[in-house]
A protein has these predicted regions:
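Conserved N-terminal phosphate-binding loop of PLP-dependent enzymes in the Aspartate aminotransferase
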Residues: 1-226
Length: 226
């Protein structure tokens, strides 16, 4: 599993890859939030660069959710994601975004990375498409006979099928016909404004309102108050 959460159901019966994992430099809030976030980003960068030095020939990619969903609706500064882009280029590694939850219009754009001013090399999708898969940017073509060029490499027992593809295409057509991505942006803007209003009304209860499109979140003081 690539999970980084403490839920034992994710790893009790399945292997957990022994990959290098680094500090999560999620956006911090409050008056010192920007300073704390930048400090966390610097620590994360040091850990990433150390991992590349230690395992130089064993690391193929940097993998991240552009917004950590199950991890606590953690957002990252676009500057940090652009830093990951630079490091991946310097180290000749791929930058992979897990957009299984953030993708397919939820954030008000088709893909969350479109908010960030950069493009990953590989994007994983699922959930709302009712089928899981990946698509790639042009950098993948640096690998001769990659999986997108050599059809037989993707025709595995657990691979996709025509029914999935037809159904997924119809979903995309409906999304375009009904402007569902634009609607997520408009309704999400209203939702975020109303959440900020609630936070102003109940400052001791609601804090750290954040969101892109309909992917909005807030913090409560404790599980009991929730």
């Amino acid at each position: 599993s690539t999970t980084n959460t403490a839920d034992p159901r994710k790893t009790k019966y399945y292997p957990k890859f022994d990959w290098p994992r680094v500090e999560n430099p999620k956006i911090r809030y409050g008056k010192d939030g920007l300073t704390l976030t930048r400090e966390a980003e610097a620590r994360s960068e040091r850990e990433i660069r150390k991992a590349f030095r230690t395992y130089r020939h064993d690391i193929a990619a940097i993998l991240i959710e552009p917004i950590q969903s199950e991890g606590g609706d953690n957002h990252f500064r676009p500057e940090f994601l652009r830093l990951l882009r630079r490091i991946a280029d310097e180290e000749e590694a791929l930058l992979i975004f897990d957009e299984v939850q953030t993708g397919v219009g939820l954030t008000g754009k088709m893909w969350a990375f479109q908010h960030m001013g950069m493009t990953p090399d590989l994007i994983a999708f699922g959930k709302k498409m009712q089928v899981c898969g990946v698509f790639a940017a042009s950098r993948i073509d640096e690998v001769k006979d990659n999986v997108f060029v050599e059809p037989s490499r993707i025709g595995s027992t657990w691979g996709g099928n025509l029914t999935d593809m037809v159904r997924a295409r119809r979903y995309l057509e409906i999304m375009a016909e009904e402007d569902l991505v634009g609607n997520a942006a408009r309704v999400g803007k209203h939702l975020l404004e109303r959440l900020h209003t609630l936070a102003e009304k109940f400052p001791r209860l609601i804090s750290n309102v954040r969101g892109l499109g309909l992917m909005c979140a807030l913090d409560l003081p404790s599980p009991e108050s929730r």
